[in-house]
């Protein structure tokens, strides 16, 4: 039997969602209601490439503000947009009651691995975007982090230099890309501390709903998938109940191991599904109070 740590005091979580299409509205808000019982620190809503989901992102965070007890964080990218266009989105978020923005440069139009060229009148990079957001108001700003190096960086040192710039311009939190080998994250945490970068590093946790899809995405992002993980999911493509049990256990083990290393906050990539994430949070001792009330 796996022995999880008994002391889960001080643990907090947050969740990422993407804005639902019209036909998925009912299931999306049911997911929100389910995970609201866990009392997350915040919930973030993604912003499609090139601003393609701008209106849906805005509508979603507005409803979260007005219809739930949750604190929303709106994602924002600067790819393919002028400063004026990006600033207008920030002002729209503020008018909707959003005080937390996840500032991301965004992927180049050609996708991961292609060359990024800033808009001639736009923000140059994520650090520049952070500075612009902070100039527009007293926002809490989160940014991204890459335990295994950004696909476009030549080294971890270059990543750390970018991280230092983002922190210097006002970012308070760095949410990591998903990873499956904890030492990558812990080494990044140590390097950030050694450089004296004043920013909270939060692990991004991705429960595996489909191992094949996660493997494909990991390959594009440069995220390592341990062979032992492949073994645990082998042959489960057509056994969803068993696959979900394994997925919940794998993610709970990862979170528990990080908690034993002093990590207190966990950010879950939900893929707009409540089942696995809710189960993991209950393993962590979260949500019981509201459920019993």
Indicate where each model-derived feature is located:
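Active-site pocket-lining/capping segments in soluble small-molecule metabolic enzymes
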Residues: 3, 120-146, 158, 196-248, ...
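N-terminal amphipathic alpha-helix/helix-capping segment at the start of soluble metabolic enzymes
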Residues: 1-18, 22-25, 131, 288-293
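Active-site mouth loops of central-metabolism enzymes
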Residues: 12-28, 72-84, 140-158, 234-249
């Amino acid at each position: 039997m796996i022995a999880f740590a008994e002391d889960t005091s001080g643990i907090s979580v947050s969740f990422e969602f993407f804005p639902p299409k019209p036909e998925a509205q009912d299931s999306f808000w049911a997911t929100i209601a389910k995970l609201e019982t866990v009392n997350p620190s915040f919930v973030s809503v993604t912003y499609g490439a090139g601003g393609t989901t701008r209106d849906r992102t805005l509508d979603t965070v507005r409803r979260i503000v007005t219809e739930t007890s949750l604190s929303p964080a709106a994602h924002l990218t600067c790819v393919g947009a002028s400063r004026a266009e990006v600033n207008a989105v920030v002002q729209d978020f503020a008018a909707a009651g959003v005080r937390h923005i996840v500032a991301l440069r965004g992927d180049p139009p050609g996708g991961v691995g292609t060359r990024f060229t800033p808009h001639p009148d736009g923000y140059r990079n994520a650090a520049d975007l952070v500075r612009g957001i902070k100039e527009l108001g007293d926002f809490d700003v989160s940014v991204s982090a890459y335990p295994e190096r950004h696909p476009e960086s030549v080294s971890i040192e270059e990543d750390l230099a970018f991280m230092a710039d983002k922190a210097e311009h006002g970012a308070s939190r760095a949410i990591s890309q998903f990873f499956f080998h904890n030492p990558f994250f812990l080494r990044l945490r140590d390097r950030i501390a050694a450089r004296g970068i004043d920013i909270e590093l939060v692990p991004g946790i991705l429960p595996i709903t489909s191992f094949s899809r996660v493997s494909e995405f990991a390959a594009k992002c440069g995220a390592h998938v341990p062979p032992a993980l492949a073994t645990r999911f082998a042959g489960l493509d057509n056994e969803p109940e068993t696959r979900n049990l394994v997925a919940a256990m794998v993610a709970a083990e990862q979170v528990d191991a990080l908690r034993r290393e002093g990590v207190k906050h966990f950010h879950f990539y939900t893929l707009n599904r409540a089942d696995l994430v809710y189960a993991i949070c209950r393993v962590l001792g979260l949500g019981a109070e509201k459920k019993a009330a």
